[in-house]
């Protein structure tokens, strides 16, 4: 069974569509879902990542959820190996793998033939020391001098990716983008469906999503994770929502600080959505569907369209 990938910006409704597609196909074939959201890999990061509770998964097996402790570093290479093994095992069982998520590099590493450039611990350590000495702003400026295209694609606050880009440029003598995957036929003949909607609609959803996270206990979730080592987690501690709450707690956890954390989480998510859209819209293989529908008949048609694409796209 060839896979179906459901991708798109945060808040578009990818997880719900995956469940609905699984229900539609369930009478004829089994479906198993493979997560492609980097932060949902972490155990305990549930509220802030909008991870589906087990009780809402309708008995459908989910893979690549809760596979890392918050102290571990999530890497695209590790995910690619593990998720590819999941997809091949699911297909071997005669079930349909459905990849669901919006983490751009994770999705593309899985669906394209992406060989990762070598790493050198001594080179990496040298750039890590440089980061500690001068800070991420100056290190990002150094990347801009060596590889302007990479610097333009990496946020100035993303220390981990800045260090990795500088390492690759030094080791290969080529721009960082030279190691990126080439878009061709997707692996396993995967059909890629994209969900998106009008910006005004999605912004409203993101505002509700952010409020719901804080109302459901994101702050307490962060407190619990801090006791489990979240602050030492290179990747997990920088996740949207979690980083903002950590900063608010460090500043005294006052009401004003928490309101600011909520607003910064919303604004940060909107910025991330812009990056997701820019990335995914470049992929000519994606079949886009309108996620702005609200009525039950329209939702049913959305599911019909996704299933039809999976069955008939060549």
Curated annotation (Swiss-Prot):
Q: What is the lineage of its organism?
A: Bacteria, Bacillati, Actinomycetota, Actinomycetes, Mycobacteriales
Q: What is this protein called?
A: tRNA dimethylallyltransferase
* Family, similarity comment: Belongs to the IPP transferase family.
Looking up NCBIfam families in the UniProt record yields: miaA
Q: Which UniProt keywords apply?
A: ATP-binding, Magnesium, Nucleotide-binding, Transferase, tRNA processing
Q: Where is this site: Interaction with substrate tRNA?
A: 103, 124
- Gene Ontology process terms (BP): tRNA modification
Q: What else is known?
A: Was identified as a high-confidence drug target.
Q: What is known about what this protein does? A: Catalyzes the transfer of a dimethylallyl group onto the adenine at position 37 in tRNAs that read codons beginning with uridine, leading to the formation of N6-(dimethylallyl)adenosine (i(6)A).
